[in-house]
Each structure stands twice: as structure tokens, then as C-alpha cells.
Amino acid sequence: AIFKSYCEIIVTHFPFDEQNCSMKLGTWTYDGSKVAINAESEHPDLSNFMESGEWVIKEARGWKHWVFYACCPTTPYLDITYHF
């Protein structure tokens, strides 16, 4: 799959600014008892990443989250969020 990500750009300290972006992968329909979401690695595979001459990714990491909502406090909803 190919994913495109956009993040808010803050250029207060241009040209020395740094941005923090995230991409969350999960399901809104199925809970953790019906869907297994696992990351292959804490660091995403960037082999197909298209580099830009204007910026670089300094670091990229991912975490798995279990979220419990008030409607169903014993049912986990899972996602993997990558921060870069």
C-alpha cells in the first residue's frame, strides 16, 4: 500500500525549523478481539520513501496503543502510530 501523509508546518525558526508528524493506522469498526494489528518493527520500513531536497526525516518510530472507551471499558481498540 502507498500512504501519503501531511502535517502542519510551523516555520517560526526557518530555515532551522523541525516538524513533528504522526500517522495512525487502525480500525474504527472492529475492536481488538476481532482484529490483530502488529508492527513488524519499532522503526518503519522507509525503503520506498521518496526523499525531498528540502527536508529529511531525522527519526521515525512506531508504537502500538490499546485504547479503552467509556462505552466499552473492557474492550480494547488497537492502533499503531508512527511519529516522524
Swiss-Prot record:
Belongs to the ligand-gated ion channel (TC 1.A.9) family. Acetylcholine receptor (TC 1.A.9.1) subfamily. Alpha-1/CHRNA1 sub-subfamily. It comes from the Eukaryota. InterPro entries: Neur_chan_lig-bd, Neur_chan_lig-bd_sf, Neur_channel, Neurotransmitter_ion_chnl_CS. This is Acetylcholine receptor subunit alpha. Upon acetylcholine binding, the AChR responds by an extensive change in conformation that affects all subunits and leads to opening of an ion-conducting channel across the plasma membrane. Disulfide bonds join 7-21, 71-72. It is a multi-pass membrane protein. The gene is CHRNA1. One of the alpha chains that assemble within the acetylcholine receptor, a pentamer of two alpha chains, a beta, a delta, and a gamma (in immature muscle) or epsilon (in mature muscle) chains. The muscle heteropentamer composed of alpha-1, beta-1, delta, epsilon subunits interacts with the alpha-conotoxin ImII. The keyword Cell membrane applies. One of its GO terms (molecular function) is transmembrane signaling receptor activity.
